[in-house]
Amino acid sequence: MQEQYRPEEIESKVQLHWDEKRTFEVTEDESKEKYYCLSMLPYPSGRLHMGHVRNYTIGDVVARYQRMLGKNVLQPIGWDAFGLPAEGAAVKNNTAPAPWTYDNIAYMKNQLKTLGFGYDWSREIATCTPEYYRWEQKFFTELYKKGLVYKKTSAVNWCPNDQTVLANEQVIDGCCWRCDTKVERKEIPQWFIKITAYADELLRDLDKLDHWPDTVKTMQRNWIGRSEGVEITFDVKGYDNTLTVYTTRPDTFMGATYLAVAAGHPLAQKAAANNAELAAFIDECRNTKVAEAEMATMEKKGVDTGYKAIHPLTGEEIPVWAANFVLMEYGTGAVMAVPGHDQRDYEFASKYGLTIKPVILAADGSEPDLSEQALTEKGVLFNSGEFDGLAFEAAFNAIADKLAEKGVGERKVNYRLRDWGVSRQRYWGAPIPMVTLEDGTVLPTPEDQLPVILPEDVVMDGITSPIKADPEWAKTTVNGMPALRETDTFDTFMESSWYYARYTCPQYQEGMLDSKAANYWLPVDIYIGGIEHAIMHLLYFRFFHKLMRDAGMVTSDEPAKQLLCQGMVLADAFYYVGENGERNWVSPVDAIVERDEKGRIVKAKDAAGHELVYTGMSKMSKSKNNGIDPQVMVERYGADTVRLFMMFASPADMTLEWQESGVEGANRFIKRVWKLVYEHTAKGPVAALNVDALSEDQKALRRDVHKTIAKVTDDIGRRQTFNTAIAAIMELMNKLAKAPQEGEQDRALLQEALQAVVRMLNPFTPHVCFTLWQELGGEGDIDNAPWPVADEQAMVENTTLVVVQVNGKVRGKITVAVDATEEQVRERAGQEHLVAKYLDGVTVRKVIYVPGKLLNLVVG
């Protein structure tokens, strides 16, 4: 064994061994308990960042630990390879998205291997290959036949200059990112999957997810947004159709003083024909894309349509306004406004001088003061005719019943969740497998024409999708009739919604999934990824699993038992102000800093002499130039050091502050372990451990070893507090380094301890542990070695700590044998100098003894 720890030599050698032996390749084995450990697959952007490294290190630690418990562990990896960034990069680098993507995959795959992750590479998937997306296309056609897929018009961002659809991220300050033309909203036909058909089950089954973070479940509950209310129909004077609204507060119905419709509503469109102000307003709304999150804070605007609706219970005429806070794609595109009891309605009514009618009493029974804001709390009705005096629930039921009786209302359960729009007007995605005949009939692509392959050898102009620009690509025949292929591609969330299942059978050619393999491995035991995926990916992931279950492919209801959301990686951020007042962000690697006695940064400059402003720790990002390249750190310290720091610096679900001093500390610790093993093995062969022959000191050290095994096992397995597990191993190492190494049993005990330490560290630092296990004479590869088991007998304490009090005040602590008698404890207490001085010249009047815990001497 060489004296110096040289990670660059060890790590490449061990990685080659894993590759040659195919150590982490697994197959279904009914005789073994399975464990499926999965990290969210990366987008092949070109280089791994520290967020990736953290995510995948957590997964690898869990997978290696479960493997050492004797389980059949599947840990696969792949590439979420479609998406818009590839199109931009292809234009910029004068290439096509496919070669750019495949080059990135090759580079990042090498990076993952360099970090020593124990993946089953035989199951690697790239979602941009026809071998993968063909099954997704086939599944989509089956969903269409089941009535779970439909086409309708929906609004998109449209650049009139480039004549193309823009993704939200391509709209900068309302203008096209390429030509700076003002972007319009345009209605075009798009494909949707009926996720709303599963809304109830998606909501209900959240209760089954005991090992998912509450925050994620709450976000999904709110996103699905189930509510119970009443759908009410209004007649409108001079308008051929009725208006339907939905409300969760029918108790306030007698206070409705206006209706509001979306700018795109047919009523508003009709009214605009004779109303220039309304026409201009509709135009303004059409070209303003409002994210739902911004709806609450934006300025409320509207125009009176001139139409009057008839209140179904009072017969009063109430105005119908077009308003920018009503969206056509939500509900019916019309809402009932009760400004006395809804703050948004109140602000709008106040702005435009509309009637505000209170119908709910304040909590003290008085009429509410509506001079400054609406009363939104529930309460007792007044000003409501026959419903006066009713509290919320009774009023809800009475008004709902009355509306139903008159045939103008019915109780409804509503969802905030909308159907999933899967059409994207991009090139780099899986083609949607639908065709249109010359007579306009829309059909799914016949199975014998699947997959519909996306051509990869294309020229990108940065404006139009190559498959839209080439009229020949769309031409096909179905049943001998000419047809045109759909030129939209799938939302890339489609690919990431079922990849976890395909990992169970990536080579299967008979269908989307081999049910036998899928049901052996599924559900995933632990799924690791960022909380930013809580409502999009993680909802579609759950939805797709239920679709596959209902297609008979899987038997479980949910795709993953446990979800672990790792925290973000933060780093110091610095900038200097440029000549034009702009901020120039400087990498923390290039910042020369001065710190105070507490280690806080007080001054910083860069190599060019710029005084730097330190903004504290923030998420590693390109915009702040504070990302740390994992490759550089691995080359400097080795993969094991980077992995150990990642797992030690912070609990897995909390933010991690990148500190190179901490990385250096992790490196020093690995060197200490190496040094101790080197010194130990250099002394030659070791005798067998004779537990019965150990001295008290040796027994105490062995007790520490086995207590550490018990703690680390619990910390990694049950609690998943990996940082405290590492801290416990470090504490044990400090004791082992001080332990005597001369006697035969000293060395035998150290051998047992070091073999345990190396196995406990193996999930975190697998390369160095692989090597040290061999040096310590461990049987076989450490990858197949069992996890150390704590010896219950070794952990039994033969001494205990007794607190000694004199007249109720603590005067000392003594160590006594577990089976010591009261007399022996009193005698030992008298020998303790801190206690003895309080007993000089006094009489002990009473003794209170709690065996093994407390001795209280009452003196006088």
Curated annotation (Swiss-Prot):
Q: One biological process GO term for this chain? A: leucyl-tRNA aminoacylation
Q: Which sites bind ATP?
A: K622
Pinpoint motif 'KMSKS' region by residue range.
619-623
**Mind listing the GO molecular function terms for this protein?**
aminoacyl-tRNA deacylase activity; ATP binding; leucine-tRNA ligase activity
Motif 'HIGH' region, residue range(s) on this chain: 42-52
| E.C. code | 6.1.1.4
Q: Where in the cell is it found?
A: Cytoplasm
What GO cellular-component annotations does this UniProt entry give? cytosol
Q: Which reaction is catalysed here?
A: tRNA(Leu) + L-leucine + ATP = L-leucyl-tRNA(Leu) + AMP + diphosphate
Q: Which family does it belong to?
A: Belongs to the class-I aminoacyl-tRNA synthetase family.
Q: What is the official name of this protein in its record?
A: Leucine--tRNA ligase
